[in-house]
């Protein structure tokens, strides 16, 4: 170990507890399955008696380690125990690729779920959430805990069950959107989440840093004429860059020139492009952004009539996400697809704000060290580097830099060809769909077979299948950013994964119920290429044909499964979970599980003969070679790609091929790199220069600082809105879950505060009482509540003269609250429980409506305060002040509207079978109708 190695420091810190867990190994191993399972209830009882999770850590980790060995055949290494301890303490564990992060999460998840408050394990996509729930979830189930899974498209009840489990596997987006939907619920029956307790984020840097700039938004439709988007797209297409407009790629912004401004006005026949009534400027600017900054197969792909955003960090599609402020519609107009309506934000939250709402948060990643400052400053999370189980023996070569892209691509092509001829597996990392397909075309010309993994749907569906076989001899895999791919690249191929795919291929078509339209689909011949089996894998995936004996055993096992479970009777998720359990070692009495497990083991053994031999061969050749084709805007993402090679001490190598025309250096490189481009004229000759290497590193650091500053600014501004959001959602939830007495207490409070507002607005206490406009005050109170009709100025002037404003206020508050109680009695006489339903409806509808308006208003404030920097004012301070004023006015408006609606509420008895409506000033919605 090097002196000062952070992983050595981590090891020393936790070694005593690791030794204590190891010391319990023999005793834990001697326990029967039932005795091991009984430990869970013993731990829960000890927590109830006052012990803490820290007190139980050593014993709980020993139990999970033993359960993992029995169920999965995997025994966590010492370094994995250290990772689990780091997560339990609410920190980030940096663990190299291939060191078993997924298994690590089982340790703190079990320990923190013992309290009964639930643990969320968050992954970046549905596939990984399902895989981890099916795989690691077996440990929790074996130990007597419930394990939940949340997937896109699940119904409310399924989500409620999932979140109610001891350990819940879920994606970051599903978790965030469920939080927002819960805070739009109209009754408690719509709530799916419970209070947050402990969260473990896998690929924590991807979620908390890469996605920090993208808020989660629930929108409602707002009408906007699509013709304007089409007109603007035509104008943008006709305009010339650097004449009609300038593009700032660094800021991702465009600016109309004087010529562009005049030309747009002439073409549109308007006198002012910035007229707020038409807002043509916004349409034109968005159309130019769509043309210049949003590139097809880089920033998005087109699928049918839909524009689907591609995540620039992970290379995955972001189904259902849309750019805001009309940009998505501008891209739709550019591509000639159906333009969807503009939207208005109803609820939103950033990941920065959302994940800080957990009492305890931990995370895992292979690359966090470069972002230590950000994790500490924004999330108050420390990063601990976990030592590797075996020393890293990967060789990272120096970057090869060319003047132009042509030279770079020729060199990449030669490098792939050279490695392929040797028989070494090659992983080529690209930054976009477009680039990955460009390399694929070059390899087609050279006759080199390859697998392509990018955001296009036909490739995404085979993702795990492709990645799991990327380590086979001579394999070439082209992939957009490898962040969060979740499947390890095993040298020689993954026999276990292939065996599972082989069983799955035969089993699923027999036990999974047909989907709607599947029969018709099959009749059209769309499944002919896979023999009518949509579960079939690509031809040539398996290393050998099954022996006759094993093939027969597979057929019999599938027949047994059909007999026991029913023919085509299972949901796909249920079948996947049963298959996952069959491919592990957990105890079972299910005849079908045991039959499938037996054949799975037989297939794996046959495949392993070939993969083990191939692994030795690939190791001898030097292992996996990674080719990078562009530096990312973060060193961390580059390191993620490098980390795919050399897992668990295997040999491997990496090399980046760059060009001075790459976006990173072109946009952020500065004068030095421009000077180098002028100095070097040869296209195909690599540039070697110490100054160049330093300049490239400096450019990348500059980008990292630039985007960190953006995220920090976003966090600072969002902290203002988040504080308001928490208070609004607290008040809303208070009304949603309140008992009759609690709701009545809330209404009395609203009445008191509203009368305070009216008194303060009408009385200037600096003037003598004789000057107070009490007649106007009484008039205002009568408008607000007709029960004040019995009071006039002569009733309140003596009170004011004798006791001042406080006495006047107390008198009026008492009258207002008495009026409320009178109204309650009248409404309850009409129908028992109706008042409570009406009050709840008024609070929820007013809160939702005014919060929606507030989000729009505060968005405009944020845009406007940016200009105040020119007036030597701090935009953030200005935003806080104006935001606070808007917030206090909104809260007062909610209270006023609600209590006014209650006072004016006039329920009527209607004949049987006719619906009774609640009529008030409570917004557009109507509460559940009732029959009398």
From Swiss-Prot:
GO terms for molecular function: ATP binding; chloroplast protein-transporting ATPase activity. It is an enzyme of class 7 (translocase). One of its GO terms (biological process) is regulation of photosynthesis. Its main location: plastid. One of its GO terms (cellular component) is chloroplast thylakoid membrane. Signal peptide: none annotated. It holds the Pfam family P-loop_SecA. It is a peripheral membrane protein. Residues 632-653 are annotated as: Disordered. ATP binds at residues 95-102. Keywords: ATP-binding, Chloroplast, Membrane, Nucleotide-binding, Plastid, Protein transport, Thylakoid, Transit peptide, Translocase, Translocation, Transport. The keyword Oxidoreductase does not apply. Has a central role in coupling the hydrolysis of ATP to the transfer of proteins across the thylakoid membrane. Belongs to the SecA family. This is Protein translocase subunit SecA, chloroplastic. It comes from Ostreococcus lucimarinus (strain CCE9901). The gene is secA.
